Amino acid sequence: MKNKTRKPRISELDTLRGAAFLAVVLQHAIAHYFPLPATGLGDGVLLGVLLIASKFAVPLFVFMTGMSLFYSYDGEVPYLNFIRKRLKDIALPYLPWALLYAIEFQHVQLLDSSGWQKLGLMLFTGKASYHLWYVVMVFQLYLIFPPLQRLVKRVRPRSFAATMGVLALLFGLYLILMEQGGAIYRTAVAWDVPVLGPYFAKYLDRNALMYFFYFAMGAVAAFYVEQWRAWLIRLRYAILTAFAGMAIYLLYVVVAHFQLTPQVVIRYHDLGLLNPRMAVFLTLSVLTIYIVAMQWEQGAPGWLRKIMAWLGAYSYVAYLAHAYVLKYMERVADSLFGMDGSASARTLAAFIFSAAGAALIAYALRLAARSLKRIRQIKTQQANEKSAAL
């Protein structure tokens, strides 16, 4: 049996990847501007709306990872071959960017041994930059996928309804896990077990277990693509209403925690990913953006669909690059609007410039890689022709 099955392409995945990438860049642009003294109450509310609307990014990326893997691999998955491919596709692009961030952002000195130790720790933990934690987290899912896929094939229900029942049970367990996050952290700190202690304490935010439900939801969508789509369409009004209600509630909670005197201080700490309230909202967010993506595929102009699909195709390397680009695009935005200019306008400008710049860098790197590959092929062919002529 083939370990990877050729199936019809899930067209909305390209749109979803592009949307998730844009949402990540927007979140990080907001993170730079909201603490600044020039950010007023109106900016805080508007940026809060944008932040809430874009929080789907990480759970959607995890969902798409689960959906892509379980959709693509039906048969036996040879572990070493699978991991080798993931090292090539995920780790290989990650390493040079992590090195760049370690030197540029963390000022790691590689001329002494302690610098190399710091670099090694950063590579394994994703600490070289604020966005690289996701790569470390998602690679854990790749490491466990082959045995997990074999287990799921044996135990999963054969009907969509039964599978959704299991997913509902997993969601309940996930809410309990989110509720117990603090207890897990304190226990790990108290026990101080080597490796496992930091994994469940200092690095709990990049522990794949804390995101397992979104991966499971992606698996369900992969097993029953057509039923999944039909289910979302059937319940779209209920899902969209629940999403809107939760978004309004979260905005109320966030704004209620703004400090107004003696000066305005904007706070978004209520929007952390790992708590039960946000787990409910993020699940609704993934469902909502999937509904939007399906409608987008049906009704958006062709040129817009192509742009979003193009962003999706280059989203991983663009994701790796965007933090570096954002650092400089923030300066461009500040020069356009002034240091005392609208925080909202500067945020949106930095977001647009950074998303475009990171995507273009990813595109240029892929073109360069293809050109180098072609040059090597030509040289190899020429060498073979010379050998044959001798």
Language model features with spans:
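Alpha-helical transmembrane segments of multi-pass integral membrane proteins
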Residues: M246, L250-R370
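Aromatic-anchored segments of alpha-helical transmembrane domains
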Residues: L22-A29, L167-Q180, A242-H257, A318, ...
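Transmembrane alpha-helical segments and their boundary/interface "anchor" motifs
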Residues: L51-L60, S72-F105, L110-Y130, L141, ...
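Hydrophobic cores of alpha-helical transmembrane segments in multi-pass inner/ER membrane proteins
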Residues: V58-M67, W133-F145, L209-A222, F281-I291, ...
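Hydrophobic alpha-helical segments with transmembrane-like composition
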Residues: E104-Q109, Q117-A183, P198-M217, A222, ...
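Membrane-interface helix-boundary motifs at transmembrane edges
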Residues: R6-I10, Y73-R84, Q149-F160, F223-Y237, ...
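Interfacial loop-to-helix transition and helix-capping segments at the boundaries
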Residues: G48-V58, F124-M137, M178-Y214, Y249-V286
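Functionally critical transmembrane alpha-helices in membrane proteins and complexes, commonly lining
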Residues: S11-S72, I90-A98, F124, A128
